[in-house]
Every structure is written in C-alpha cells, then in structure tokens.
Amino acid sequence: CNGDGINNADMILTLNYFGIDTSYTRKFEQEIRAAHPDSVIIKDATHSLLSDDVYDDTYDYVFASIRKWSGLSGGVILKSSPDIEPLTRLNMDYEKTVHEAMSAKKEYIRDGKGSKERFLSLYNKAEEMLDSDPAGYGISKNAKEQFRYFDLDRVAGSRKSNCQILADNQDIWRMKGIEPVCADLSEGDIPLFFPVIFRSKDHRDKGVGKEGAEGAGQALP
C-alpha cells in the first residue's frame, strides 16, 4: 500500500504497532507524504518511541506517550510545527489512583502484602478514568521530575535484548501453540511488545496465563 487509496484527506494519522518493522512503516509514511503533500500527517510514535528515525520531517506532528515505557503516571513527548503550548491542568483523581496502584504493586512484589487483584483493579480504574474523559491533561510535577532521570538507553537495551531472547527461542513457543509474529528484529527496532499469535484461547491461558499478558496475543519484553 502506498497511500493511493486515501482521497481528499485533510489529516492523516499513522502509527506503528509493537515497535517492530519500523523501517517499513516509515517507507509507507513517506509514500503517503509524497502522494498527499498538502495533508497534515500526525504520527503516534508511542510503540516506536525508542526506534531509529522516528522524528523526521515527514510528519507535521509526532507524539508519543511515555506511560507504557516508563511506568510513570503520565506525560507525552511532542514534536510539532508550530509549537503547541503544554497543558497544565491535572486530573488529580487519576493521579491519586495511579499512585495507589503503584504502591499496592510494590508492596505485593517486594513484601508479599496485599494481592495482585487489588493493584490490577486500581490500574484498570485509572485507565477507565482516561477512557471516559476525552479532555487533555498535563504531566504531574512528580512524573516530570522522575522522567528527567529516566535512562532511555538502558531501557532501549533491555527491551532489545529481552525481545531477542524471546525471538531466539521461537521453537519452544511453537511447541506450546504460540507463533511469534516477528522471528527477526531489524537493526533499528526497539520493541515495546513481543507480539505473538495463539493457536487457541486454551493455548493462551496455558502458555501465558490469563493475566500473564497485558492483552490477548501480546507478551511484554
């Protein structure tokens, strides 16, 4: 596909899933730009945030949520022309719920206190708050300060190496009825997820566990 099927579009939104095959996605987006020079192209770079060449001149706006990469309560990296003023209003109910979930998860993992159900329930409650409220909110002071010390290179290296371990053991996955979507990683790709296809729901539940993946058919690196 080269974008020829897009007609009279004032605005085009593109995104790459999982952070894999990003070079193919970029080629597709460049073809769209060539075919639609006057359209506004917005790129959601959340999944490909740490991959190569995410922020070039093909796009008018690029945004990427840092929540999925960092575990912080909020925050977005934005490249735009002209500049967009950052939002300052905070959703305090959301911030409170996320921090309760973080504390409950930490106590469960570190001290064995509480339950997995409690912190998962709190995280789900926080996500529902965002889904039900389309208004935009700014990053909290605490999250902004923490992100200043967030080691992007370390995270990128860990994601890449962990995903490669999963890819290198694909024969074991197939024995369990799980087919990796990407058998090989491109040089510039830093994956957010390691996507897989399950032969059946039973294979998913037995191979990963009902709560072992963030979503059906996905396993985290």
Segments the model singles out, each with a brief description of its role:
Residues 13, 88-221:
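PLP-dependent aminotransferase class I/II
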Residues 2-86:
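Active-site phosphate-binding strand-loop segment of PLP-dependent enzymes
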